Amino acid sequence: MLLCRQRRLYSYIVTLYLIFFNKIIINKPAALKTKVPLLLACNHPNSFLDAVLLDILFERPVWSLARGDVFKKPFYSKLLLKLKMLPVYRTREGVENLEHNYKTFDACKQIFKQGGCVLIFSEGLCVNEWHLRSLKKGTARLVTSTWIEQVAGNSKSSALQVLPVGINYSSFSKIGKNVFINFGDLISSHEMNLNESDGKMHLQFNQKLQTALQPLVFEIEKHDKEKLKKQFALPPNAILKFLFFIPSLLGYFLNAPLYLFVKWYVQ
C-alpha cells in the first residue's frame, strides 16, 4: 500500500514537471549518471522546485535537505520524508532546534556509506534571483566532517565527492519555463588540508565551492530584460531549420529564371 502511494505521488510530480518546464538544458548530462557517494552543492533560486527537478533528472534517488520548520506538522513531515527530504534547521528557526542537525548529518553520512546521493542548498535560503549569494557553513561542516570520519575509519567505501550545481530558470512565475542546469567539476578530499582547524577548513572549502559555483549561476539584474532574454536564448531547433529550408529552396528555384533574366537585361 505504501509503495503504491509513493508511486502515485511520484507520478503526480512527473506530471507537474511536464507542465512547469518547456526545455531543460544540461551542460554535462553525464553528471546525472555519477555513481560515487555524492553531495550536490547547489544554489537555491526556486524553493521546492529545485529539489524535485534534480530528483527527477538523476538516475538514482536524491535525498535533499529542506528547511526544518516545514517538518513541524506530522502530515508534512511524513510527506516530505516520502519525497526523500530531511530537515535542517537554521538559527532563525530556533537555536533549540540546531542540535537536530546532527541527526540529519548522521543520516546523510549513512547515505554516503551506501553510495547514495544528497542535495544541499549551500546558500542556506531561497531567493528568486539570478545571482549567487554568499555560502553558509552547513555544506562545509557536512563535507569536512564526513571526509575526516572516512579517513580516520579507513573506510572501504568510495570517498564522498562534491558536485557543484547551478540551476537557472528563465522565469520564477511563468509556466512553461526553460531551465539551464550547469554542473561543475567534482571536488574531492584530496584538495583539502584536513589537519587544519574546523574554522579554517570551513573557510577554505567555502572559498573553493563559491569559486566553482560562480560560473555556473547566471548573473542578471532583476530588471535587465535584454540580458535575461539573451542569456536564456535557445539555439534554433534543427528540425525547424530544415522545414524552413525547404520552402526557401523551392522559392529560389521558382524565382531563379526571373532573377537571371532581369540580371541579363540590366547588364
Give residue spans per PLM region:
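Compositionally biased, charge-rich terminal segments
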Residues: 1-4, 50, 223-240
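Short secondary-structure junctions and interdomain/linker hinges
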Residues: 19, 23, 216-223, 253, ...
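Short, well-structured alpha-helical interface segments that form or flank functional binding sites
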Residues: 138, 204, 241, 245
